[in-house]
Amino acid sequence: MKENSKEERGRLHGMVWSSSAFFSFMWRHFVHDRVLMSAGSLAFQTLLSLVPLMAVTLSILKVFPVFASLKQYIGDFLFQNFAPAQGSILKGYLWEFIDKTSSLSTVGGLFLIVIVLFLISTIDQTLNDIWEVQTPRRRLQGFTLYWTVLTLGPVFIGTSVLASSYVWYSVFAEGALLEMKARVLSYVPVLNSVIAFFLLYMLVPNRKVRFTHALAGGVLAAVLFELAKRWFTFYVSSFATFEHIYGALSVVPMLFFWIYLEWVVVLTGAEFVFSLGYFRPAVCPAREFDPLQGVPEVVAVLRSVWRAQLSGSFMTGKKLLASENSGDRSKLGHVVDFLKQNGILHKTADGGLAISADLHAVTLYDLYTKLPRELFNGDGCVDEGPASREFEPLRAEVREALRSAMQTPLITLVNDSTEKDS
């Protein structure tokens, strides 16, 4: 019984330690990618693109007669997601603006489409920055993706609203257990959000994303999205700060604040999906101290860039992620930034990486003394990856040297300090 209890405690401790390491890794990337700043930039661009986006969406849906009678429902669907607590004032303004776009000329209509495409392009670039994609999509491939999103996105929204309406009138509108059926139907928007976020995380990054990771990120983002909607509605109804300060103009900052929250949720889900794919916990059963934290990863990146340079080509971030010899992939972005900041690597005109320093003149000690410790395993555990194992002999020597140099009893240090103070 005691052995089983110890095993359970050990397993629980391992799960807690691994979860803590995962969220610590996710938080480091969250800060490194400046998610809050990126969300603000996207929120501002979305605010400027909101009317063109809704106008283009409704215009595309007009092409399909089946969606013609659902204009009001589709508009309400978009308002619930872009402005859940703004009331009829904002709806009135936006419907007025959208109706005016119908009288635009062909050039004006094309300009609206260009604005929306720029927004989609910014979203694509921001998400790919999270996945540390150094090489952008080819122009034809990128245009095809953006145009597909622009044309099929509204169809997806219309289909969701149409399916919800059909299910409501055919199954839920009458019959027994009407209250329970209505409650079940209330979860349909959450399901739509899960699907939308899943497709966003699965298709937009120019990386291979696992199905389960994208689905988990979609679920997390959908839950956070619903919580954000409820909190924002409560905030606006209970604390009328914006209305008190801005008066009739309060609808603009409130709308901007809500769109900002939306993008924070979207990018947080993206960071979660990225972390699921690239986090690798250090194996540390005995919690043995590693005096060479970060060295294997830095040397592995340098080796990959050097070998590519010798072969007449340049290493890219995408190739580094795909390489099995580049060390812990979760740290690649930090390693490359560190090497560039210290003048050892530089970025070429076409986005590749090249050696800047004379590697004959730079020693391992020079590199070691400049390593930013906070970017690596803060717990001091040994990473047992292939790039780390080759440093085991050197690691043992350094550990032994430290052990020999630090055999001084603490009482000696305390007494020396006391004597000097007196």
Curated annotation (Swiss-Prot):
Pfam (any one): Virul_fac_BrkB
Domain of life, source organism: Bacteria
Localization (cell): Cell inner membrane
Ranges annotated as spanning the membrane: 12-31, 47-67, 103-123, 143-163, 184-204, 214-234, 247-267
Disulfide linkage: none
Membrane topology reported for the UniProt record: Multi-pass membrane protein
Keywords: Cell inner membrane, Cell membrane, Membrane, Transmembrane, Transmembrane helix
Any single Gene Ontology cellular-component annotation: plasma membrane
Annotated InterPro entries: UPF0761_bac, Virul_fac_BrkB
Family listed: Belongs to the UPF0761 family.
Name of the protein in question: UPF0761 membrane protein CT1325
Gene source species: Chlorobaculum tepidum (strain ATCC 49652 / DSM 12025 / NBRC 103806 / TLS) (Chlorobium tepidum)
